[in-house]
Amino acid sequence: MSKSTNVSYERVELFENPKVPIEVEDEILEKYAESSLDHDMTVNELPRFFKDLQLEPTIWKLVRNEDVIIEGTDVIDFTKLVRCTCQLLILMNNLTVIDDLWSMLIRNCGRDVDFPQVALRDHVLSVKDLQKISNLIGADQSSGTIEMISCATDGKRLFMTYLDFGCVLGKLGYLKM
């Protein structure tokens, strides 16, 4: 794991706006063009797009529409789609790391026992779950539980998904780029 000792703006920016290899961008563009040849690509076409690129379904199904659309529409924004797809590729290349750390969080807050039928990557962590983990490790309650979720979700939700968690790890430098 390539852990950095401090988080720099450059590190966060590298994950938020990854450098896209030309061959990857070409393949994304090709699949996008196939989906939008005679019309604008919409969110309804995302599943097929991601399947055509052979991306991991348990990851891409967590992508939120608002992260890839032109605001106020259901039309896909190509720039956002490229960024999102590249981030998904980074996450897919680091599934073992993300799975191990996510599993540890799920176990330590008790969600694995409370919701045994839920697949690992389908769990969500709430503020309450993170507070349980903070108590378990003896961290001060004011240690930023809400701030952590707010950072992971850009302040949009009070729970964190597997995808959110993977993105936080990427921003912190725990994932191989």
Swiss-Prot record:
Q: Which Pfam families match?
A: Rad33 (PF08730)
Q: Which InterPro entries match?
A: Rad33 (IPR014841)
**Where would you find this protein in the cell?**
Nucleus
Modified positions (N-acetylserine) in chain numbering: 2
The annotated crosslink position for Glycyl lysine isopeptide (Lys-Gly) (interchain with G-Cter in ubiquitin) is 19
**GO process terms (BP):** nucleotide-excision repair
Recorded GO cellular component terms are: nucleus
Which superkingdom does the taxonomy of this entry point to?
Eukaryota
Q: Which UniProt keywords apply?
A: Acetylation, DNA damage, DNA repair, Isopeptide bond, Nucleus, Ubl conjugation
In the UniProt record, does the keyword Chaperone occur? no
Q: What else is known?
A: Present with 1080 molecules/cell in log phase SD medium.
Q: What does this protein do?
A: Involved in nucleotide excision repair (NER) of damaged DNA. Required for the repair of RNA polymerase I-transcribed rDNA and RNA polymerase II-transcribed DNA regions. May have a role in stabilizing the DNA repair proteins RAD4 and RAD34.
Designated name of the protein? DNA repair protein RAD33
